[in-house]
Amino acid sequence: MDYFSIIKITMITEIYFQYVIYILCFGVLLLLKSESDRLLWLHLVSILVGLIANYEMKFNVLFAMFHSAVHNLWPFLKNTGYDNTEKSVYDVICHTIMVVICYHQICYTENAVTNNYYTFHLFSVMIIIGALFNCVVSGKAIGSNDRFLHSLFEYTTIFQALSTGYWVATMLWYHHLDNIHFYSHWIIWIGLMTINWFVYKFYPNLVGISMRYKYVEAVFIVCTWYSGIISSPLIKYINVY
């Protein structure tokens, strides 16, 4: 087996190993007894990862933690679904910034998404515009009793679901954005989070369960861990020696 074949197999193993780690970390949330324990675990691991990660991944880890903090400070997602008495604007702004960060990173990665180039960029711009529109609607809905406005907000949150898939796909493969299969990986996560949005829409009680187990926060946080760890200068130093 030649050198390049070994490199390819190693890369594929690493990429799909991240999926296993991602799923196992969600399993830990099921084992922990209380919401505070789950929140503590998510943030404690994030702090440890952030301490060793490079500067780019430090920012991404911290931003995922910030998103978690926003959900706890302005909990507009309740056991019964969307609560229009709480401010959602801070969360959707956070989502929009996330998708812009990811799009920027992909655009400045050499040879990223060379296949389906125009489809990817067109869809990315549509997601960003839709997410910005959702932010505007959310801001207008603050203190408003207009049912149409609140309904419009709810339906346009699908763009934030798309931004969630965008974030997870980018963070999981942060060091492999130039991989030929990244576009397929990206489409899968966009699709999964779209399905997730429809499930929440038609079964609002599941929102309460997912919030209780910190699923909504973990989706954004856990995907940064592995990429954060392997970005560490310490890991690169160990590999050299």
UniProtKB/Swiss-Prot annotation:
Keywords: Membrane, Transmembrane, Transmembrane helix. Its main location: membrane. GO terms for cellular component: membrane. The keyword Transmembrane applies. It comes from the Viruses. The chain crosses the membrane at residues 12-32, 39-59, 89-109, 117-137, 152-172, 180-200, 215-235. It is found in: Membrane. It is a multi-pass membrane protein. Belongs to the mimivirus L68/R809 family. This is Uncharacterized protein L68. It comes from Acanthamoeba polyphaga mimivirus (APMV). The lineage of its organism: Viruses, Varidnaviria, Bamfordvirae, Nucleocytoviricota, Megaviricetes.
